[in-house]
């Protein structure tokens, strides 16, 4: 028996690429611009995809488009499918010389990152490094969703799908405007921290919980320099790696205070999915990380 299938009813790879772009960009116009398609084509393909799956994938509103519950479920599969397609290409096209795009995420305060990136670029100039900043929890999620090839995060972590590589360990310092600091000040002075998902914030909150202290106020930021400059102006106090505040401390604009050893250090690890295809560019990147980790240990 021969089944006649209409060509326009078959889900194509480009439909998944369009769907992913609209989901990421939040609008048809932005997705069309990113993919270099006309808007009407993007709209038609999304509508066709919804008809084929017999479910709405997006909510339409004046500000753009957001995923429905079914759309969010669809996005997980689309990320995986497109990642598998990329890996399929890599298996056959990957040459001995590292090349292509390497999408790397990182928390803001990896002191060894510039050295690692510089060394890697000098050794492998044919690799296009794409760097994305974020918080530990969101970077883990993006690695798991195949949106990033790997990421530098605050660790260590335990996850069955993730493997990790040691990068560095740093001291955490409490940073204040005043030279003297008493632990009771946590109840009278605002805490300046990154959003939830930051490793330093987790350490600070654990310390305060163990001490039975309730901070007066928590003010959230997403830029390190804004936090440090706000501390220098007397807005509040924060906890960050020593290397991140060295320049302001040396200039006398802020003062650093050691905290109990139990909470006083943070490790940076590089993570990737265990089941991701190991390209030559990633293998070389891990080798560069390992070399600099050994240098730091000497």
Curated annotation (Swiss-Prot):
**HTH lysR-type domain ranges (all copies):** 11-68
Summarize which parts of the chain are annotated to bind DNA, as ranges.
28-47
Keyword field: DNA-binding, Transcription, Transcription regulation
- What are this entry's molecular-function GO terms? DNA-binding transcription factor activity; transcription cis-regulatory region binding
Pfam families per UniProt? HTH_1, LysR_substrate
Residue stretches spanning the membrane = none
- Mind telling me which Gene3D superfamilies this protein's record contains? 3.40.190.290, Winged helix-like DNA-binding domain superfamily/Winged helix DNA-binding domain
Family in the record = Belongs to the LysR transcriptional regulatory family.
Q: Could you tell me what this protein is called?
A: HTH-type transcriptional regulator CzcR
